[in-house]
Curated annotation (Swiss-Prot):
Catalytic activity: shikimate + ATP = 3-phosphoshikimate + ADP + H(+)
GO molecular function, one term: magnesium ion binding
Cofactor note: Binds 1 Mg(2+) ion per subunit.
Gene Ontology CC annotations of this record: cytosol
Organism listed in the record: Mesorhizobium japonicum (strain LMG 29417 / CECT 9101 / MAFF 303099) (Mesorhizobium loti (strain MAFF 303099))
Name recorded for this polypeptide: Shikimate kinase
Length: 203
């Protein structure tokens, strides 16, 4: 069945949930890609809990991510991040948004592969720059040339992100549209008929 003969939205969403079982949908990608906003929307569409790993880290540590970076350094932060993500993954199904560096950890990738389905929100540099320039809470971008930092991170991380189960190009569009494209990409990944039209599954 092709996309023009797709299932009614409810049937495909139910089939997708069935294929997920106890696994989580795990969003990966660079800062500014929209992991939290899109992840939250996907969770709503699937009636699943939404977890943001950075928020979980802040809850556990009682410190903000920038404070953790400043006080303990990136290595200690990554170790805490790994522990938190591994714990969260034990409680699927859910939708989990991870920090930009989380997927670079081999043990974290292994845990995600075992307990989830990874979704890379792939964004172009200009979109990322536009989004991150509006926020002041990005420890890795405290630089005289944040664009160069992002370019370096893209060079280092995109080949690893590309090993994700699903890749969805993101852009400056409504989150409902991107979230629906994520759901259709997951349907294709599992061999499920796509949802009829993105507008039909907005909530």
């Amino acid at each position: 069945m092709n996309a023009h003969q797709a299932n009614p939205p409810g049937e495909s969403l139910a089939a997708l949930l069935g294929r997920l079982g106890s696994r989580s949908i795990v969003f990966v990608g660079l800062m500014g890609a929209g992991k939290t906003a899109i992840g939250r929307k996907v969770a709503t569409m699937l009636s699943l809990p939404f977890i943001d790993s950075d928020q979980e880290i802040e809850s556990v540590s009682r410190m903000t991510v920038p404070e953790l970076f400043e006080r303990y350094g990136e290595a200690e932060f990554r170790a805490l991040e790994q522990r938190v993500i591994l714990r969260v993954l034990e409680n699927g199904p859910q939708v989990l948004s991870t920090g930009g560096g989380a997927f670079m950890n081999a043990q974290t990738r292994e845990a995600i592969a075992g307990h989830g389905v990874s979704v890379w929100l792939k964004a172009e540099l200009d979109l990322l720059m536009d989004r991150v320039s509006k926020k002041q809470n990005r420890p890795l971008l405290k630089s005289a040339d944040p664009r160069a930092v992002l370019e370096r991170l893209m060079s280092e991380r995109y080949p690893v992100y590309a090993t994700s189960d699903v890749t969805v190009p993101t852009r400056d569009d409504r989150k409902e549209v991107i979230a629906a494209e994520v759901l259709n990409a997951l349907c294709r990944h599992f061999g499920i008929d796509e949802i009829a039209a993105t507008g039909e599954i907005e909530s």
